[in-house]
Regions:
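Conserved active-site and SAM-binding loop architecture
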Residues: 1-218
Length: 218
C-alpha cells in the first residue's frame, strides 16, 4: 500500500527521502528551496493550501525560533523595548502556525519541535526523544506531538558524544557547538535537520502503523 505523505517545513528532505525509499508518495514542503537533491519531490510554497488536501500522514517541523524556551530572555519588554514587543508578535504568529498542523484535517499527524512553550500553550508532547536512541551519538531533546500515531520505539541506543563546556560554566551538545562557526542561515538549517536514525524510524514505524490501521479498517 502506497501512502500519500506531506512533510512540512522540511527543506533538507531527510524524512521525505526515507518514506520515498519505502515506496511511498512523500513530498517535502518549505518556502525555501530543497537541499536534499530531489526537487521533483519538493513543494516550495506556503503549506496552508496543501493542508486542505487529503494526506495519509502529515509530519510538520514548524520553525522553533519563537517557540523554544532558550529564547525567553529576549521577551523582556523593560530591557529590550520594541525588539521584545516585535518578538512577542512573532511568537503569536509562530503559535498560530504550529496550531495549523495541530488542527489539520488528517487522521495521522506528527509535529516536531524542541522543548518550548507549546507544552503550556497547547499541551504536553506525547514523547520526547533523542538521536542517541536511534543510532546517532548526539543529544538533541526533541518533542513529538502525535495524533493517530504510536510513540517511536528506540532502535539503537548509543552513548552520546560528551557535551562541550565553556569557561562560563555553560555547556551545549557537541553537534550544536560544531554549528557555531557556520553562517546564521546555514547554522539554522543544521540545527533543524532531522538525524538519520530518527528519520528512518519515523518512516518505517509510522508507515507500518498506518498501513496496518487501514488494512484492519480502524
Amino acid at each position: 500500500m502506497k501512502l500519500r505523505i506531506l512533510v512540512a517545513c522540511e527543506e533538507s528532505q531527510a524524512v521525505t527521502k526515507q518514506f520515498r525509499a519505502l515506496g511511498h508518495e512523500a513530498y517535502s514542503c518549505d518556502i525555501l528551496p530543497e537541499s536534499g537533491g530531489h526537487p521533483e519531490w519538493h513543494l516550495q510554497q506556503d503549506v496552508t493550501k496543501l493542508l486542505e488536501q487529503q494526506w495519509d500522514l502529515i509530519i510538520a517541523f514548524p520553525p522553533c525560533t519563537y517557540l523554544t524556551v532558550t529564547g525567553n530572555r529576549w521577551f523582556n519588554v523593560e530591557k529590550y523595548g520594541d525588539k521584545a514587543l516585535k518578538r512577542i508578535e512573532d511568537r503569536k504568529d509562530a503559535i498560530n502556525f504550529f496550531m495549523l498542523f495541530a488542527n489539520a484535517n488528517a487522521d495521522h499527524v506528527a509535529i516536531e519541535n524542541p522543548v518550548g512553550i507549546m507544552s503550556t500553550e497547547w499541551r504536553k508532547p506525547n514523547q520526547i526523544i533523542n538521536p542517541f536512541q536511534f543510532g546517532d551519538p548526539f543529544e538533541k531533546k526533541t518533542c513529538l506531538w502525535l495524533k493517530g500515531l504510536p510513540e517511536l520505539t528506540a532502535t539503537n541506543i548509543v552513548e552520546p558524544a560528551p557535551r562541550k563546556f565553556f569557561e562560563s560554566g555553560k555547556s551545549m551538545p557537541a553537534w550544536y557547538a560544531e554549528c557555531w562557526h557556520l553562517p546564521s542561515d546555514e547554522r539554522s538549517k543544521m540545527r533543524s535537520k532531522t538525524f538519520l536514525g530518527i528519520a528512518e524510524a519515523m518512516a518505517k514505524q509510522w508507515s507500518e502503523h498506518i498501513i496496518k490501521t487501514k488494512t484492519n479498517g480502524h
